[in-house]
Amino acid sequence: MASKRILKELKDLQKDPPTSCSAGPVAEDMFHWQATIMGPAESPYSGGVFLVTIHFPPDYPFKPPKVAFRTKVFHPNINSNGSICLDILKEQWSPALTISKVLLSICSLLTDPNPDDPLVPEIAHMYKTDRAKYEATARNWTQKYAMG
């Protein structure tokens, strides 16, 4: 069941890739993908290329995929291990969702962080109290880690 669904999503992604994202299996393992997300133009991540790993559980799509950033990113909802605090990857997951929708949600999280549900409280605090410093730091990290 899972591998059929994953294969279908791969075909759909190749046919109609989401804006500024790409994804596909690593080697021959259909349950382990790598995705690339381009930093959104209207965000401090602009110009960056962010690598993301996707691990599908055996009971996908009934359980959400595990998605994590491999590229370091300065963001209130993404921690230093690359874990992403995003409701659709946790309690709001639904089998109707696809990897394409997940990648688009991550892109919009880069543009619009959610400081009220932070994974990194210090960054959320900076985002709320000193937006200029947050944006400068995020831009700096993007240049350092996502433009190599």
Curated annotation (Swiss-Prot):
Pfam families: UQ_con. This is Ubiquitin-conjugating enzyme E2 8. One of its GO terms (molecular function) is ATP binding. Highest expression in young stems, old leaves. Lowest levels in floral buds, anthers and young leaves. Induction: Not induced by heat shock or wounding. Accepts the ubiquitin from the E1 complex and catalyzes its covalent attachment to other proteins. Mediates the selective degradation of short-lived and abnormal proteins. Coiled coil: none annotated. Residues 1-147 form the UBC core domain. Its EC number is 2.3.2.23. Belongs to the ubiquitin-conjugating enzyme family. One of its GO terms (cellular component) is cytoplasm. GO terms for biological process: endosperm development; protein ubiquitination; ubiquitin-dependent protein catabolic process. SUPFAM superfamilies: UBC-like (SSF54495). Keywords: ATP-binding, Nucleotide-binding, Transferase, Ubl conjugation pathway. InterPro entries: UBQ-conjugat_E2_core, UBQ-conjugating_AS, UBQ-conjugating_enzyme/RWD. It catalyses: S-ubiquitinyl-[E1 ubiquitin-activating enzyme]-L-cysteine + [E2 ubiquitin-conjugating enzyme]-L-cysteine = [E1 ubiquitin-activating enzyme]-L-cysteine + S-ubiquitinyl-[E2 ubiquitin-conjugating enzyme]-L-cysteine. The gene is UBC8. Interacts with CIP8, CHIP, NLA and XERICO. It comes from Arabidopsis thaliana (Mouse-ear cress).
